């Protein structure tokens, strides 16, 4: 409004285009030419568009929780493939901490905001033959529709396919047509409709806004009052911004990254997540090849993947997340019509450069023409484990409880011929402190006690001392596990926090209720105290189980590093 008041009208503002200046990497000490440009409103333009075939790649933007440097991996490998194919490769990105914004990566780099106006300004100057929006994560994908509506040629997965995958109504129609099951759910645009939908679906429900990355504002709720509070305070809900309400199914979570060329689908590997549904996939430990699902489940997953890749109209990379329940029923959680954060991991684990293969597909080279004539290659004999890394100690007050909203800030990979050793390497590399002695502090939700009992017994039989809050401690004692009882904060005692601060506690295991929706303030205080005192803490019993497998397998000594 200020600018309109100064220059007269919005059209007058849009008639003023920026020019591009070259960044001087030598601070005027020496003559330098680097194709690294920024925009400014001056007169002389230093970026001269060449008359040659060119492809523009949209980067992933600033690194934040939910969208890390893993997405930049796909951008960089795409640029290399584009250059090798004889095109001029142009990148738009605005994060100086990534490889894609190294001026030696692409033929031209524009350090610009990833918003429609700034991207269009570059496109109007360069006139690329096509723009790739599916290799820069959700930030780039969100630009596809507004760019295409302005006449830009989007190559690879187009806007129609993106809409099929990300629009709830379109996606449900597609799944119904393909006879692929998904958890019962509904998109709602106001609070009362949300309450009615949850009642019809059945609690607990998973609620989340549409078109988000990293599970932002995603939550499992078990009661109507929780749902009302969430819809009032956690998200903006209206006709343009619906909230998705899905039935929460407790089961294994499985993930694939695939490539579709319109005729065939290639799935280099199936990854199984250690933590069950309810923990964001980016915060889960991911294992390739899968370690507990049956061959039948794998066949179903591959069948659904083929149908979805072709049915949506994917051209390039896509990612699918599945739920496998106790009866081995397979459900679709979501399809992401773009590169995902697991592409670097799966590329390294399988030996297939997924971003390179997908970029060739986008440029018109089919999978068969690339020598790929199988949907699912033979699995590797090594185990590969991707473990999340967290920065809770640097994020004051953040709850370390793992939930549908992503919280990890990095990841590490371990691999070995033996599964527990691969897990050990990944956990150690991600910053988990492991000890095979000491004390385990346990505080469990009532619904988790039966499942946790054999795990706590394994700690006890390994020689660990067990301490617990009153309810958990009495339960363990009743089942023959010697336990020292610690009073809760709600009992006007800080002894459990003092015990954690004292330094003798090796592990804290803390879970909270999902099915009942009852959460206690004690849990948050216990978790924060563990984090602030560098005590290894787990909020998922699935993670505890793999930790025990590691502790029972690993002995301190010299072991070979496999090539």
Spell out what each predicted region is.
Residues 28, 49, 53, 72, ...:
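ATP-dependent carboxylate activation and anion-phosphoryl transfer catalytic cores
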Residues 196-205:
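Acidic/histidine-enriched active-site and ligand-binding environments that engage anionic O-linkages
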Residues 10, 14-22, 267:
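Short, solvent-exposed alpha-helical "recognition" segments
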Residues 21-180, 189-196, 415-561:
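ATP-binding N-terminal substructure of ATP-dependent carboxylate-amine bond-forming enzymes
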Residues 219-222, 558-563:
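Glycine/aspartate-rich loop-and-adjacent alpha/beta segment that forms the canonical ThDP
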Residues 1-8, 13:
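Single conserved hydrophobic/aromatic residue that forms the stacking wall/gate
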């Amino acid at each position: 409004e200020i600018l309109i008041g100064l220059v007269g009208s919005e059209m007058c503002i849009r008639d003023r285009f920026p020019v591009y200046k070259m960044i001087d990497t030598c601070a005027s000490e020496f003559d330098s030419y680097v194709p690294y440009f920024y925009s400014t409103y001056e007169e002389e333009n230093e970026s001269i568009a060449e008359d040659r075939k060119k492809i523009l790649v949209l980067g992933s933007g600033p690194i934040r929780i939910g969208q890390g440097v893993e997405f930049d991996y796909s951008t960089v490998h795409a640029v290399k493939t584009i250059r090798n194919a004889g095109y001029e490769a142009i990148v738009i990105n605005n994060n100086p901490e990534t490889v894609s914004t190294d001026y030696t990566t692409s033929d031209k780099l524009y350090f610009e905001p990833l918003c429609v106006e700034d991207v269009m300004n570059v496109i109007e100057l360069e006139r690329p033959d096509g723009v790739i929006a599916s290799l820069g994560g959700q930030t780039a994908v969100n630009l596809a529709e507004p760019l295409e509506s302005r006449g830009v040629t989007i190559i690879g997965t187009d806007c129609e396919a993106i809409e099929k995958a990300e629009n709830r109504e379109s996606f449900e129609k597609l799944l119904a047509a393909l006879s692929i099951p998904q958890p019962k759910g509904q998109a709602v645009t106001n609070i009362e409709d949300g309450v009615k939908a949850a009642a019809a679906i059945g609690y607990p429900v998973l609620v989340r806004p549409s078109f988000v990355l990293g599970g932002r504002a995603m939550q499992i709720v078990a009661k109507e009052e929780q749902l009302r509070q969430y819809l009032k305070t956690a998200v903006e809900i209206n006709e343009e911004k619906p909230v998705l309400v899905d039935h929460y199914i407790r089961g294994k979570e499985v993930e694939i990254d695939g490539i579709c060329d319109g005729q065939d689908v290639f799935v280099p590997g199936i990854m199984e997540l250690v933590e069950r549904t309810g923990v964001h996939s980016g915060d889960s430990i991911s294992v390739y090849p899968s370690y507990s699902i049956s061959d039948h489940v794998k066949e179903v997953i591959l069948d659904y993947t083929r149908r979805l890749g072709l049915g949506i109209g994917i051209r390039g990379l896509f990612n699918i997340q599945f739920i496998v329940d106790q009866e081995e029923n397979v459900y679709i959680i979501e399809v992401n019509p773009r590169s995902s954060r697991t592409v670097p991991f799966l590329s390294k684990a399988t030996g297939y450069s997924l971003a390179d293969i997908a970029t060739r597909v986008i440029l018109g080279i089919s999978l068969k023409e690339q020598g790929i004539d199988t949907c699912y290659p033979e699995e590797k004999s090594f185990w590969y484990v991707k473990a999340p890394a967290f920065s809770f100690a640097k994020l004051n007050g953040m709850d370390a409880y793992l939930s549908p909203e992503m919280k990890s800030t990095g990841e590490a990979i371990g691999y070995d011929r033996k599964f527990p050793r691969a897990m050990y390497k990944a956990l150690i590399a991600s910053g988990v402190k492991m000890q095979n002695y000491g004390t385990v502090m346990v505080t469990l939700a009532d619904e988790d006690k039966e499942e946790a009992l054999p795990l706590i017994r394994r700690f006890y039989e390994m020689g660990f001392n067990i301490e617990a809050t009153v309810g958990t401690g009495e339960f363990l004692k009743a089942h023959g596990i010697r336990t020292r009882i610690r009073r809760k904060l709600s009992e006007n005692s800080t002894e459990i926090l003092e015990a954690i601060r004292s330094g003798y506690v090796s592990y804290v295991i803390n879970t909270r209720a999902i099915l009942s929706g009852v959460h206690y303030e004690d849990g948050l205080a216990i978790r924060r105290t563990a984090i602030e005192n560098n005590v290894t803490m787990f909020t998922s019993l699935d993670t505890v189980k793999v930790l025990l497998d590691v502790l029972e397998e690993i002995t301190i000594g010299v072991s070979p590093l496999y090539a």
